[in-house]
UniProtKB/Swiss-Prot annotation:
This is Ribitol-5-phosphate cytidylyltransferase 2. The lineage of its organism: Bacteria, Bacillati, Bacillota, Bacilli, Bacillales. It catalyses: D-ribitol 5-phosphate + CTP + H(+) = CDP-L-ribitol + diphosphate. It comes from the Bacteria. Its EC number is 2.7.7.40. One of its GO terms (biological process) is isoprenoid biosynthetic process. The record marks 14, 22 as: Transition state stabilizer. One of its GO terms (molecular function) is 2-C-methyl-D-erythritol 4-phosphate cytidylyltransferase activity. SUPFAM superfamilies: Nucleotide-diphospho-sugar transferases (SSF53448). Pathway: Cell wall biogenesis; poly(ribitol phosphate) teichoic acid biosynthesis. Keywords: Cell wall biogenesis/degradation, Nucleotidyltransferase, Teichoic acid biosynthesis, Transferase. The keyword Glycosyltransferase does not apply. It comes from Staphylococcus aureus (strain bovine RF122 / ET3-1). It is an enzyme of class 2 (transferase).
Length: 238
């Protein structure tokens, strides 16, 4: 089976003084989360579309689903965890409790605050994860990347044409991700905040799918302005 895991567990501290977590803020008079869910509903391959949100915001999430007529029975809401990976594991726990987990099951995980992903990106994630077990969505780095260990001096400059910027979705064979996560120590779980990094550390290859420049993550007031400009300018592909 194929599952979507929409990660809406953040509280949006970088957004500044706002009344709601960032995933519930509006762009073009509609919550960011709803824009994102609508993209996933269009994909018939998904057996379930699972939204993980802070426990105290579950009721609000359910309310906005009703308000914006999200009636697709595949859409479920569960409580997120204390960090990104724990949130993903909570989604997987839901899957295991409801349907069990089979060897070929795939989960497509995606930031709730990336509302501009395309159908191509989603479907390529499904195809590549089903074939290879793990995939990340990336774009080529445009700017030169510099590394600094002390935040004051450059310690190295990687070769730019080998650098990519990670986006989401990140998609996995569920058993591969679950087994890789369970093998981590408590210390590793605190350090390895990215699911693809966990897979890489386990020794398994992670394939790449091409993202889009406009597949932005809305985390700051500036991002919110850019997101509204993208919608009003009809920049993003469907």
């Amino acid at each position: 089976m194929i599952y979507a895991g929409i990660l809406a567990g953040g509280i949006g501290s970088r957004m500044g003084n706002v009344p709601l977590p960032k995933q519930f803020l509006d762009i073009d008079n509609k919550p960011i989360l709803i824009h994102t869910i609508e993209k996933f509903i269009l994909v018939s391959e998904f057996n379930e579309i699972i939204i993980a949100t802070p426990a105290q915001w579950i009721s609000h999430t359910q309310d906005i689903l009703k308000k914006y007529n999200i009636t697709d029975q595949r859409v479920k809401v569960v409580a997120g965890g204390t960090d990104r990976n724990e949130t993903i594991m909570n989604i997987i726990d839901h899957i295991r409790n409801v349907n069990g987990i089979n060897n070929n099951d795939v989960i497509v995980t995606h930031d709730a605050v990336r509302p501009f992903l395309t159908q191509r990106i989603i479907k390529e994630n499904i195809e590549v994860a089903a074939k290879y077990g793990a995939v990340d969505t990336v774009i080529e780095a445009i700017d030169t990347i510099v590394m600094s260990k002390d935040k004051q001096n450059i310690h190295s400059i990687p070769v730019r044409n080998e650098m990519y910027q990670g986006q989401t979705p990140q998609s996995f064979n569920i058993k591969l991700l679950q087994d890789s996560y369970r093998a981590l120590s408590s210390e590793q779980k605190e350090i390895l905040s990215d699911a693809c990094k966990i897979i890489v550390e386990s020794g398994h290859a992670v394939k790449l799918v091409r993202g889009e420049l406009y597949n932005i993550k809305v985390t700051t007031p500036y991002d919110l302005k850019v997101a509204n400009a993208i919608i009003q300018g009809d920049i993003a592909d469907d």
